[in-house]
């Protein structure tokens, strides 16, 4: 296999909340409208930003992370995208240099130039100092330039532009506008399907970008070929039911791809709307927002009975975060409303007003060693003894429990299944 060349940018910022998702989505929508094939990636383990970016580009969005995804798998994803795209966009995470690994680490590793998005709404000449710091903090960092966001007027944009050193390219400015805002929830953005006017917002952002910013394709980046890896069909003939609806939507596209590459047939179903399970051998219950759908979930008795029968028959279930909460005795929301859940795992969970856990996790299971992350606002009390506990690579004390009851495996951890394909197959193989 040989290297592939494709124009690429990594959209980063000095901090969260600067508008990375808006700018990345606007670039994706603008170039897609021009007939270009755009592939978008997201740094880190986030679920919600990729939903918006997939809508903007018309293509599935994958995560890139030097630890959770791994360097070799990240290389493969970028190389494959370069073979089918006219433009690759990567949205960073947090601030450009924040975290270990950071967005800057990814940019350096794969030679992708950084476009820094800076919220200029409350600054003038300091904009140039901030841009200079981002460019020069790591001299070896490939740096494309800066784009100002939430600019108050044409004159304000000119002041920001003129504050830049000559060595930093000005990509333009996006005006402050409610028409382009992407509402947020505690995990970041709301889910794409919850925004009835999302396409109008994306088009408005793309229009504004076309009028006030540089929109030519960036220079091509050479993406090295990955090491070829072959997967045995360990799940050949296995039918896996995957919950996917407004309550359970936190799915890594890479997880679905892996299960299919292992030979599984995926059948999607809705615990909110379906009265019965499809004919499946295994179940995958991902995370989401079950606390926002307590009544609908608790009132769907036929679905609850079907999942209980699946478990009683000794069939595999993998439940992550919100999927695990659905299997408890009960769940209480922030308004102190409690609902009966499925009762397959002893315990109660209660939603908290603040974040309860945020960390990368790696856990050793009998089936293998899986990586992933945890991010939740609930607290769980259960008498069940954990099968194992996760470890955080960044020295945080977070150590999420993994519970097992028969063939049911449940945890707050959102697993990145390609981190150990053999373990993924063993968890879901009948």
Curated annotation (Swiss-Prot):
It comes from Stutzerimonas stutzeri (strain A1501). This is Hydrogenobyrinate a,c-diamide synthase. The a and c carboxylates of hydrogenobyrinate are activated for nucleophilic attack via formation of a phosphorylated intermediate by ATP. CobB catalyzes first the amidation of the c-carboxylate, and then that of the a-carboxylate. Its EC number is 6.3.5.9. Catalyzes the ATP-dependent amidation of the two carboxylate groups at positions a and c of hydrogenobyrinate, using either L-glutamine or ammonia as the nitrogen source. GO terms for biological process: cobalamin biosynthetic process. Comprises of two domains. The C-terminal domain contains the binding site for glutamine and catalyzes the hydrolysis of this substrate to glutamate and ammonia. The N-terminal domain is anticipated to bind ATP and hydrogenobyrinate and catalyzes the ultimate synthesis of the diamide product. The ammonia produced via the glutaminase domain is probably translocated to the adjacent domain via a molecular tunnel, where it reacts with an activated intermediate. Keywords: ATP-binding, Cobalamin biosynthesis, Glutamine amidotransferase, Ligase, Magnesium, Nucleotide-binding.
């Amino acid at each position: 296999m040989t290297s592939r060349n494709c124009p690429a940018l990594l959209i980063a910022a000095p901090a969260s909340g600067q508008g990375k998702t808006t700018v990345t989505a606007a670039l994706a929508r603008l170039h897609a409208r021009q007939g270009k094939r755009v592939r978008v990636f997201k740094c880190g383990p986030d679920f919600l930003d990729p939903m918006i970016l997939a809508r903007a580009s018309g293509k599935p969005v994958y995560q890139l992370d030097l630890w959770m995804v791994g360097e070799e798998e990240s290389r493969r994803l970028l190389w494959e995208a370069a073979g089918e795209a006219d433009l690759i966009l990567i949205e960073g995470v947090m601030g450009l240099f924040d975290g270990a690994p950071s967005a800057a680490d990814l940019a350096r590793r794969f030679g992708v130039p950084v476009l820094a998005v800076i919220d200029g709404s409350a600054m003038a000449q300091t904009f140039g100092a901030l841009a200079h710091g981002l460019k020069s903090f790591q001299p070896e960092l490939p740096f494309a330039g800066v784009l100002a966001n939430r600019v108050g007027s044409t004159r304000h944009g000119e002041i920001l532009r003129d504050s830049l050193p000559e060595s930093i390219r000005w990509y333009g400015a996006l005006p402050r506008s409610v028409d382009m805002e992407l509402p947020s929830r505690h995990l970041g953005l709301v889910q794409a399907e919850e925004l009835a006017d999302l396409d109008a917002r994306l088009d408005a952002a793309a229009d504004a970008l076309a009028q006030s910013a540089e929109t030519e394709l960036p220079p091509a980046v050479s993406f090295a070929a990955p090491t070829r890896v072959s997967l045995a069909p360990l799940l050949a003939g296995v039918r896996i039911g995957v919950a996917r609806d407004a309550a359970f939507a936190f799915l890594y596209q890479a997880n679905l791809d892996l299960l299919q590459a292992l030979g599984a047939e995926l059948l999607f179903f809705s615990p909110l709307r379906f009265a019965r399970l499809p004919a499946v051998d295994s179940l995958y219950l991902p995370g989401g927002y079950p606390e926002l759908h307590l009544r609908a979930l608790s009132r769907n008795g036929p679905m609850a009975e079907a999942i209980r029968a699946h478990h009683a028959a000794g069939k595999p279930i993998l439940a992550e975060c919100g999927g695990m909460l659905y299997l408890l005795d009960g769940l209480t929301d922030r308004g102190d409303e409690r609902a009966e859940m499925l009762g397959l795992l002893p315990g109660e969970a209660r939603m908290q007003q603040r974040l309860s856990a945020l960390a990368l996790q790696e856990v050793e299971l009998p089936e293998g060693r899986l990586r992933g992350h945890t991010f939740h606002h609930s607290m769980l009390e259960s008498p069940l003894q954990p099968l194992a506990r996760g470890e955080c690579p960044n020295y945080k004390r977070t150590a999420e429990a993994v519970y097992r009851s028969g063939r049911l495996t449940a945890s707050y951890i959102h697993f990145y299944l390609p981190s150990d394909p053999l373990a993924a197959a063993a968890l879901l193989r009948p």
